Amino acid sequence: MKLFGTDGIRGIVNEFLTPEIAFRLGNVLGNMVDKKIFIAKDTRASGDMLEEALVAGITSAGVDAYKCGVLTTPALALITRLENAAGVMISASHNPPEYNGLKVLMRGYKLPDDIEERIEREMEKIRYCEYKSVGKVIEYDFASEEYFEYIKKQYSFLDLSGIKLVVDVANGATYKLNPQILEYFGAKLEVVNDRPDGFNINRDCGSTHPENVKKNITGSKIAVLYDGDGDRCIFVDEKGEEFHGDKILGITAIDLKKENRLKKNNVVLTILSNMGLEEFLKNNEINVVRTKVGDRYILEEMLKNDYTLGGERSGHIIYRDKSTTGDGLITTLEVLSSLVKSGLTLHDLSNRIPDYPQVMVNVEVKNKEIYKNKKVFSLMKSIKDYRVIIRPSGTEPVIRVLVEGPDLEKITDIANKFYELIKELDKE
């Protein structure tokens, strides 16, 4: 059975993702690494169950399990980098609470495909250590503090006094730490969705549901919204308009270039980033490279060519001189730093970057390979002067259709045609 998707192992708990899978993963990792493995989780009720299974698997292979408790993915990535160790993040990111996931990190980085394939093969067998070598379980209470200290050093110059910020922590992993750090830098906060109960993570809140925050933006307030594991964010400006990943990349790329932080004068985007962003960057003499969808592919391109900045429209942004992975908090601080330096409003900054209309439809299907049908290709060939991207979701039974172009009515009509065609083909 195929376990690893685009972002680790992820699925509905006790239907696809079971304690047995967590145990087997822990056992394989314990047999692959030396000494210790760090474990963190978001606020889902199923996190405790999966954590205990992971711990059992790790220690059964003779390796110590360090439990970090509730922590963001980027904070765990930092710990594994500082400790030169492996880690497992228990989270399904932006997915609803019935989902959970297991994301493996090695010295700060997500695993390449070939290592995941090797792990998947090894999970078919279990190898126990001798009873004298069973690993220990260690409560590692310093992870949040280590991350906090790292951020303070990286942004020691930053003064956010005067910034009024609504912070939507999605009832997820950011609910304590991110507000504490933003307050440390002087921002005046209104924190919402910060009462996790195990079942409300991402529920009508956070980066995938900005509608409620948009309604409540007044005066000079702006908002930042995180996802369940804190590796991405989006903003809402003073006018209640969304300031998404493309806008973040455009604005911060200009500042990175001024500060000589933008290596090789290049930004890495995915195929989903708007053509308006690409035009804006090129007009500012910044080059663009595009990859497949997924922050892992962005990072691979960045590492291969030594680029500093890359990201996705969804808010996964990697500042490689600060972090080895997408980090919602670092993204927040970079945007707010640009905002303070500019003396403008976030809305004014946003308006600098053109944004062609995009329509995305999610088509629920039984067969995710249906998008390869000849009739779908035929319809794509018939579309002129508009960009169409069709791809299966890596985590859900969904095919995503993105249409981009200057005319909203036209792209909506095109998107609906693809929706109807794929639905019809899926019935056959």
From Swiss-Prot:
Q: What PTMs does it carry? A: Activated by phosphorylation.
Q: Which GO terms describe its cellular component?
A: cytosol
Its GO biological process annotations read: carbohydrate metabolic process; peptidoglycan biosynthetic process; UDP-N-acetylglucosamine biosynthetic process
Offer one Pfam family short name for this entry: PGM_PMM_I
Q: What cofactor is needed?
A: Mg(2+)
- The EC number of this protein is 5.4.2.10
* InterPro entries in alphabetical order: A-D-PHexomutase_a/b/a-I (IPR005844), A-D-PHexomutase_a/b/a-I/II/III (IPR016055), A-D-PHexomutase_a/b/a-II (IPR005845), A-D-PHexomutase_a/b/a-III (IPR005846), A-D-PHexomutase_C (IPR005843), A-D-PHexomutase_C_sf (IPR036900), A-D-PHexomutase_CS (IPR016066), Alpha-D-phosphohexomutase_SF (IPR005841)
GO MF annotation terms: magnesium ion binding; phosphoglucosamine mutase activity; phosphomannomutase activity
Q: Which UniProt keywords apply?
A: Isomerase, Magnesium, Metal-binding, Phosphoprotein
Query: What positions does UniProt annotate as the active site of this protein?
Result: 93
Give the top-rank taxon of the lineage listed in the UniProt record for this protein. Answer: Bacteria
Q: How is the cofactor bound?
A: Binds 1 Mg(2+) ion per subunit.
Query: What chemistry does it catalyse, as a reaction equation?
Result: alpha-D-glucosamine 1-phosphate = D-glucosamine 6-phosphate
Q: Which Gene3D superfamilies match?
A: Alpha-D-Glucose-1,6-Bisphosphate, subunit A, domain 3 (3.40.120.10), Alpha-D-phosphohexomutase, C-terminal domain (3.30.310.50)
The transmembrane residues are: none
According to the UniProt record, list the residues that bear Phosphoserine. 93
Enzyme class at the top of the EC tree: isomerase
Record: residues binding Mg(2+): 93, 227, 229, 231
Task: Family membership, please give it.
Answer: Belongs to the phosphohexose mutase family.
Function (record text): Catalyzes the conversion of glucosamine-6-phosphate to glucosamine-1-phosphate.
Kindly give the NCBIfam families that the UniProt entry links to this protein.
Answer: glmM (TIGR01455)
Protein name (record): Phosphoglucosamine mutase
According to its UniProt entry, this protein's organism is Thermosipho melanesiensis (strain DSM 12029 / CIP 104789 / BI429)
Q: What is the lineage of its organism?
A: Bacteria, Thermotogati, Thermotogota, Thermotogae, Thermotogales
Q: Gene encoding this polypeptide?
A: glmM
